[in-house]
Amino acid sequence: MARVTVEDCLDNVDNRFELVMLATKRSRQLATGGKEPKVAWENDKPTVVALREIAAGLVDYEVVAQEDIVEEEPLFAAFEEEANEPL
């Protein structure tokens, strides 16, 4: 298990607040099983894996947001189909 420091992550993120928000969102994606890790899992918790991905420069807001958009598209498509049905 590799140790991850805040300083390692701040090389790829602007500030600590952004780091917390990004790590939280990514760790939730990993914990729910919806997304595959971009680094070896190594028996770590989802939060540690998310921080390791950020420190390695593999995950940023664009990657996390893009994965969310792909996940939400079918939900909105089904909602729009129901809204267009005649009453």
UniProtKB/Swiss-Prot annotation:
SUPFAM superfamilies in UniProt: RPB6/omega subunit-like
Catalytic activity: RNA(n) + a ribonucleoside 5'-triphosphate = RNA(n+1) + diphosphate
GO molecular function per UniProt: DNA binding; DNA-directed RNA polymerase activity
Single biological process term from Gene Ontology: DNA-templated transcription
Keyword tRNA-binding: no
A single Gene Ontology CC term: DNA-directed RNA polymerase complex
The EC number(s) this enzyme carries: 2.7.7.6
Top-rank EC class of the record's enzyme: transferase
Segments crossing the lipid bilayer: none
Annotated keywords: DNA-directed RNA polymerase, Nucleotidyltransferase, Transcription, Transferase
Subunit structure of this chain's protein: The RNAP catalytic core consists of 2 alpha, 1 beta, 1 beta' and 1 omega subunit. When a sigma factor is associated with the core the holoenzyme is formed, which can initiate transcription.
Family to which this protein belongs: Belongs to the RNA polymerase subunit omega family.
Protein name per UniProt: DNA-directed RNA polymerase subunit omega
Gene name of the encoded protein: rpoZ
